[in-house]
């Protein structure tokens, strides 16, 4: 059951490699690479990826493999194929994600052509993993000997298993003093039913056993690709990125046939036609070999104008031979699941910022962007993200780059409104939430998105974590003791809306950092959610409204009015701050009018002047009042939202 769910969940990755160009390689070097590939039969191709929980050593192991096969020079911890860390730190991406290697296996006296695809283990980028799986015959399931099986290990296992990949269990970090190899092997056998005898023990750091045991296992256990050279050419579009010199670059897996530079191809999904300008392998940079054939994973430069024409999962075919070519099953398009509003702060121009925001989004194909207008904050944008991590990474990036220039609202998830007349509406903005009258008369049910969360943790934190999940409206579905040593796996159905509220941070803090989390969409469920609004002198500030479960409304409402009061300076008239849900006021705070003492400097005798001044003050008040809540400095909104 989980396996089928796993297939359903498919995401785009959200960063683009900036690939160094390899035309620097001497033509003779490229010729010899070409010759070497030509001499290797498809039976000697091995396409695989490494899957693991974050920090279990994927990138380090990739480095060792690239060194041992002579792709890169040995020495140092380079993480040549790593991107997520850099992405997190600097919001940029530096390296290609896939690499071709040549390996001469002395046992057989033969050359092998190996494609390694490194994958980020994080949940929001699961699509990355599944897409790379689609071009692989197998995967190394890497487990840190000092940590054992963790949440992403489990989730990635299900995905790989569901895609029929041959899995090689690998225990890493056996050089560590506190490595508990026996325990890790136990967990792998108990959790995944992969026999202990099949496990390979390595140290990616020192390289121990990588050459001796791991490379031979890759050759012996991972099956070669199954395509057919004589069939019409077809390729699966696995990934794409934008290169400022050559434009759109596609990473493709050649399923059948052969394709060459200059060939004309067409896309099954868009029907558009292209002529291949450049073609080759990632080694580790773009290395133009002029040809790719069945079973290989490589790149093509199609002279494509827009990145959005590169549909992940698309099939490329030879122009004119579409009728005889079977289109590949492809992938499901990912849908944004977390949304925020962004608005220019005081004094910033929408127009100028619009270009910036659009540019930022352009680099990240998986972000959706729409115009939006707010009563308090004016014209802005609505941004959609794949998941809560994706949203927070991007939001951090916006804040770092546009800090004071943008006001960013609280994240929200989509809600499904089901009407009595049978139609449905998906809303991604609290502003679209049906009002009480509509709810009473027309709405049959409101649903919110749920996920199945997998958590692993040491038993001593079980109580804390269960409490946290209950507090976040979770429903326990499974509890499994991974082995005798006290590692537990918990499964909960949780509302995605709760996850967005820094659930991961809270989980880490109640487990002293030991618990790990992974999750997967499981669809929409009926829910008693309402819209909570913040009112200022009676009018609702739309950009601050939030949809939440009715059980949370009271607590959040009280906190809101209290907090907002802190940021409002006293005005010349009374300001009433209220929280309202379902047409009912939940909480209220008042800021007393500040009576500017305009009379202070006057002598008591100067009565006419005194009267005049009082009248003037009254008019001033009237003027401010007529402007109403807009008098609030936008800094206040910004401070309120930055909690
Ligand atoms: P990834 O997130 O799975 O790509 O993990 P990394 O390759 O970035 O490794 C995470 C951390 O573990 C880094 O600090 C590595 O240096 C360290 N590491 C990886 N493999 C080993 C190993 O075999 N032994 C030891 N002691 N540390 C390792
Ligand atoms: Mg890594």
UniProtKB/Swiss-Prot annotation:
CDD domains: EF4_II (cd03699), EF4_III (cd16260), LepA (cd01890), lepA_C (cd03709). It comes from the Eukaryota. It catalyses: GTP + H2O = GDP + phosphate + H(+). Gene3D superfamilies: 3.30.70.240, Elongation factor 4, C-terminal domain, Elongation Factor G (Translational Gtpase), domain 3, P-loop containing nucleotide triphosphate hydrolases, Translation factors. GTP binds at residues 52-59, 118-122, 172-175. GO terms for molecular function: GTP binding; GTPase activity; mitochondrial ribosome binding. Residues 1-18 form a transit peptide. It is an enzyme of class 3 (hydrolase). Its EC number is 3.6.5.-. One of its GO terms (biological process) is positive regulation of translation. It is found in: Mitochondrion inner membrane. InterPro entries: EF-4, EFG_III/V, EFG_V-like, EFTu-like_2, G_TR_CS, LepA_C_sf, LepA_CTD, LepA_IV. Residues 43-226 form the tr-type G domain. Keywords: GTP-binding, Hydrolase, Membrane, Mitochondrion, Mitochondrion inner membrane, Nucleotide-binding, Protein biosynthesis, Transit peptide. GO terms for cellular component: mitochondrial inner membrane; mitochondrial matrix. Pfam families: EFG_C, GTP_EFTU, GTP_EFTU_D2, LepA_C. It is a peripheral membrane protein. Promotes mitochondrial protein synthesis. May act as a fidelity factor of the translation reaction, by catalyzing a one-codon backward translocation of tRNAs on improperly translocated ribosomes. Binds to mitochondrial ribosomes in a GTP-dependent manner. Belongs to the TRAFAC class translation factor GTPase superfamily. Classic translation factor GTPase family. LepA subfamily. This is Translation factor GUF1, mitochondrial.
